[in-house]
């Protein structure tokens, strides 16, 4: 990208910026260490960050962003169309231990589909504390037999792989046998997100304030609830901040009750950059990488 000399507003400091698309985090870390990359916002593999500890020209800055990791359940398929099964799966997973495993406990266990950096985030009580016995009771009441087999698909990114492996172990303890299905991004986007052809999947939604996806008829996890629809329509129709906030909290509570997906955790955002770079976003409210205020400091 080159600076536009005819831009009407404040001119950016940098003359040009080159974006490099590097899907392999290890290769990206090598490029950062070699000085071939100057910055990597939202570095995806936390276990690699230690490589930068002794790099004098680099710094790692931890910030916030609307990261919401979920175990998405296909509400249009049996047995996930039964709320008791979805709640049982939530009880079967120790989400605090999960957060500890994937991020050394740095983050927040989620109770609904909203990240802590959202102004409307509601710190709801934990409706589904780790309780394998309660999970077995709910599965039995829903007619789910021990040994029931399901498939858990996940895209090629570290948190999804690690989380999926741990969830498979937790569900096996309550009688659900999980087959792990790793997918490359094109296959995941086509089969899971596009066609809704899956049982369960681990994915992080990083769009800000995207709770409205639960009111979409075409959403990949096939959740439909008239009560949530009514709340969202009232939210959309209101312009009063207090009313919208109250309705947002109600929507979060409704999702926590229905548990269309198992809400797992939100973790911070790590940005790796040259120590002389200034002005790059480290906290991210929206999915953007503004460059107008970025500059090199001595």
Locations of the language-model features?
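Bilobed "Venus flytrap"/periplasmic-binding protein-like clamshell domains
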Residues: 1-8, 100, 129-138, 149, ...
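Detector for C-terminal structural segments
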Residues: 3, 92-122, 159-168, 186-298
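Ligand-site clamp/hinge motif
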Residues: 4-50, 168, 177-179
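Alpha-helical secondary-structure segments
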Residues: 14-16, 34, 66-111, 138, ...
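Periplasmic-binding protein-like
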Residues: 59-73, 117, 225-231
């Amino acid at each position: 990208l080159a600076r536009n000399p005819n831009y009407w507003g404040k001119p950016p400091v940098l003359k040009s910026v080159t974006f490099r698309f590097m899907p392999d985090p290890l290769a990206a870390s090598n490029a950062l260490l070699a000085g071939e990359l100057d910055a990597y916002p939202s570095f995806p593999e936390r276990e690699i960050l230690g490589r930068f500890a002794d790099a004098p020209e680099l710094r790692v800055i931890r910030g916030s962003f609307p990261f919401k990791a979920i175990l998405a359940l296909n509400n249009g398929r049996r047995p996930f169309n039964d709320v008791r099964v979805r709640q049982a799966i939530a009880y079967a997973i120790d989400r605090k231990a999960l957060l500890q495993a994937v991020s050394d406990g740095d983050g927040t266990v989620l109770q609904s589909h909203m990240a802590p950096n959202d102004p409307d985030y509601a710190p709801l009580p934990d409706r589904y504390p780790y309780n394998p016995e309660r999970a077995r009771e709910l599965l039995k009441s829903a007619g789910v037999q021990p040994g029931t087999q399901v498939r858990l698909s996940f895209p090629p990114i570290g948190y999804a792989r690690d989380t999926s492996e741990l969830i498979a172990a937790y569900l096996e303890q309550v009688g659900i046998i999980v087959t792990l299905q790793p997918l490359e991004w094109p296959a995941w986007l086509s089969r899971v997100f596009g066609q809704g052809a899956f049982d369960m999947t681990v994915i992080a939604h990083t769009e800000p304030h995207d709770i409205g996806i639960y009111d979409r008829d075409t959403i990949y996890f096939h959740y439909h609830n008239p009560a949530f629809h009514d709340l969202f329509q009232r939210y959309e129709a209101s312009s009063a901040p207090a009313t919208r906030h109250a309705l947002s909290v109600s929507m979060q509570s409704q999702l926590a009750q229905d548990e269309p997906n198992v809400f797992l955790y939100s973790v911070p955002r790590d940005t790796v950059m040259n120590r002389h770079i200034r002005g790059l976003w480290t906290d991210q409210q929206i999915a953007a990488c503004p460059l107008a205020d970025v500059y090199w400091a001595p």
